[in-house]
């Protein structure tokens, strides 16, 4: 990454992680990061697709899984090894500024696979259902953004 982009990235991280904080977000953000927190939503989504769309719903689920796998592999196997940005909690120059609410993972951190995967789900669902439900666009983007923000927070 270029020097100016790295500086912007660090400054943005410090602002979100250290300054834009609150007791409510301290409670909410770890929940949003927890994959089990979203299990009921995914169960509802899969049930909804199967009940309302039968065989086509199963195909939608299959493509949803493929979209997530593709997004995850793209972020984890292609982008992260080339960008090689350490997680802020593991970066010796940055970790003194990090406020951790959950444990610190290993490996590289850009892009966030959680954020990439959830934005992939949001775009896929919006593509499927926007013509029927216009509200899905702002809701899905807000959902994916909230998860992305919680990864930084």
State where each predicted segment sits.
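Interfacial segments of alpha-helical transmembrane regions
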Residues: 46-75
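Hydrophobic, aromatic-rich transmembrane alpha-helices
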Residues: 41-52, 118-127
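Juxtamembrane membrane-interface segments at transmembrane alpha-helix termini
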Residues: 71-80, 148-153
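Membrane-helix interface segments
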Residues: 24, 54-60, 131-136
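Transmembrane helix-loop junctions in multipass membrane proteins, especially transporters and channels
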Residues: 54, 84-89, 131, 152
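N-terminal transmembrane-helix/juxtamembrane module of multi-pass inner/ER membrane proteins
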Residues: 1-42, 75-106
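Membrane-embedded catalytic cores of phosphoryl/pyrophosphoryl-handling enzymes
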Residues: 99-153
